[in-house]
């Protein structure tokens, strides 16, 4: 069974540069055997809420930005 990962990122951080690398990041995790769920933050404390939501549903949580 494939492992699941949620990747939470702030699209406004770093002048939005992560958007250009997002597919490369996902590819790295896919090659590591992870199914990747991508979530962009929309408001203050959104990353915290996303972590709470996925804490029991995925094998790994990665946050950026």
PLM feature spans:
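ATP/NTP phosphate-donor binding region
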Residues: 1-64
């Amino acid at each position: 069974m494939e492992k699941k990962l949620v990747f939470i990122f702030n699209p406004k951080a770093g002048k939005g540069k992560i958007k250009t690398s997002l597919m490369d990041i996902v590819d790295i995790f896919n090659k590591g055997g992870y199914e990747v769920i991508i979530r962009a933050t929309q408001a203050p404390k959104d990353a915290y809420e996303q972590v709470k939501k996925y804490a029991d549903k995925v094998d790994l949580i990665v946050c950026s930005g």
